[in-house]
C-alpha cells in the first residue's frame, strides 16, 4: 500500500488513457478469467519505466509490478499464485491480469493503477457465475389422474450461482405466474439449490416447462413434463373385479344355455312320444271301424224268433 501511495504522489497532471471494459467481466467458477486493462504506449516505451498496481477487492495488500519486477511478498493469501500479469505484453501497453481458478469470493471491483512518467487508474467489475444443473421434474400425485384433479409439479436444480430466475410455461408457451412457490438455499460452498412448485388443475393433457435463468451467465436450462388425465382410467382393483364379474357372467350364460338346450331336447322327445301314441290310437280306432258286417238270411231270422 505504501508503494501505491508513492506511485500516486509521483503522478503528473496528464493522465494515461487507460481503457477497461464498460460492462462487468464474467468469470466462471473454477475457471480462469482475464481482467483487461490497457493503454497505447508512446515510442521508446519500455517496461523498465513502468509501475503497475492492481487494487484487489476487500484486500489490504495489492498485486504490483514496479520497474520490471513483480511484488510477490505483499500479495494477499487469497490471491497468492493465482494472479499474474502478461509480462510479454507489457511493452505493448497490456496491463491485464490473469486470475486463475475463480472463486465466489473473487467477485468485486478491481482497480488498475499505471504510472509511466504520469499515472492513471481505471476499474473493472468482476462477476462470478456458476451454471445450474438441468432441472428435474416430479409430479404429485402421479397415478390414477383424471381431468379436474389438482396436481403439483416440482422443479429441482442445483449448484448454480447467483440466485436463479424461475419461469413456468404451459404447452402453448404461455407464462404461468399463479400458484407458484420457489425457494433458493445456498450450500456450504455458496452455491444454490432451487426448488420451485407449480399447482394446477389437471386438464385432459398438458405440458409444463420449468425454465431456469442465470442472470450473470445469461443462460437458460429447462425441462418439460407432459401430464395426462384419463377419463376412463380404472384403479387396478376395480379392473380385476370387472374382469372377474365378466368371467362369472360368461360362465353363467354358458350354463344357462346348456340347461335350456337339455330342456328343449327333452321337450322335443316328449312331444315326439306323444305324437306316436296318438297316431297308434287313431290307427286302432280306424281298424275297428273297418271290420265287415255279418249278413244273415230271412229264414234264419224267423228261426231265431221262434226259438225265442
Curated annotation (Swiss-Prot):
Keywords associated with the record: Disulfide bond, Immunoglobulin domain, Membrane, Repeat, Signal, Transmembrane, Transmembrane helix
Gene3D superfamilies hit by this protein: Immunoglobulins
The Ig-like C2-type domain, residue ranges: 135-228
Example of a GO MF term: signaling receptor binding
Region entry Disordered, spans: 270-308
Keyword Signal among record annotations: yes
Parts of the chain on the Extracellular side: 16-236
Biased segments, Acidic residues type: 299-308
One GO BP: T cell receptor signaling pathway
Ranges in the topological domain labelled Cytoplasmic: 258-308
Disulfide feature: 37-112, 155-210
Annotated TM spans: 237-257
Bilayer topology term: Single-pass type I membrane protein
Family: Belongs to the immunoglobulin superfamily. BTN/MOG family.
Protein name: CD276 antigen homolog
Species of origin: Xenopus laevis (African clawed frog)
Organism placement in taxonomy: Eukaryota, Metazoa, Chordata, Craniata, Vertebrata
